[in-house]
Structure formats: C-alpha cells, structure tokens
Amino acid sequence: MDRLSQILWRERELLELLAYKLEVERLVLASGRTRWLVNATREIEVLLEDLRATEVLRATAADEAAEQLGLTPNPSLAALAEAAEEPWRGILLDHRDALVGVAREIAETSEDAKGLITAGYRSARETLLAIGGTSTASYSAAGAAVADAPRSHLLDRSL
C-alpha cells in the first residue's frame, strides 16, 4: 500500500503540473502570441509521456494492493479504499478526491483552450475568405486545382 500511495502522490504532482501547463497554453492562445505555442505544447507532450509511465506503475501497484486485499486485478481506487483498513482507507480516499478534482480542472482548461483554437481557426478562415475569394479549397475532389474567378479591385490613386 505504501508503494501505491507514493505513486499516487507522484501522479497527483504530475497532474497538477499538467493543469498548470495547460493554463499557460490557454493564456498563450488568449494573448494571441502564438510564437510560444509550440514550446507550451512540447512541454505538455513531455509531461504526458511521464504521466503515461506513472499510470503503468500505478496500475501495477494497484494490482499488488488488490491481491493483498483479496480483490480482483484492476480495481478502482474507491474499491481499494473500501477494502482497506484505516489509515489506508482515508489516504486512498484523499488521493481519489484530489485526482478527481485536478482531472475536472484539466477538463475545464482544455475546453477553454479548445474554444480559443476554434475561434482562432474561424478568424483565420474568415480573413482568408475576405482576401482570396469565396472558397478556401485548393483542390477539387478529382485533384484539379481550384481557382476563384479574378476579382476587380478599386484603387484610390489620389493618395
């Protein structure tokens, strides 16, 4: 159980850091300074790799704890807590509550960032349509180049 608790602490730390990195990415998107977006995204990808490795360790430790408690493999954290005696019951429930809270925070921040990305895409598309014509398509379904009809432009020569 001690090993499982230590791994859960590590997972909580990584998830808190992920929440922070996602917030930074959201702020970069909101500011429009997309120059830093690649760096923010790279940091998140590295952190996600660490999280995946920690999840494997947690699953292994949870299976070991389940075996000690007479549970089937791949138990939920709530099931482990229910089967465990104090103080482990309280410790595991605290971990569960903290993990649920940070997961909720991550989901909300991700939705905000997704909204900003969608708005940015829409804005860029509208700008391209205003500059280049009625379509953003470059090629037809058959592979032929699509070109808009030439547009006449007004030019003020009095300047």
Model-derived features with residue positions:
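Extended, charge-rich alpha-helical scaffolding segments
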Residues: 1-79
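Short terminal interaction segments
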Residues: 76-159
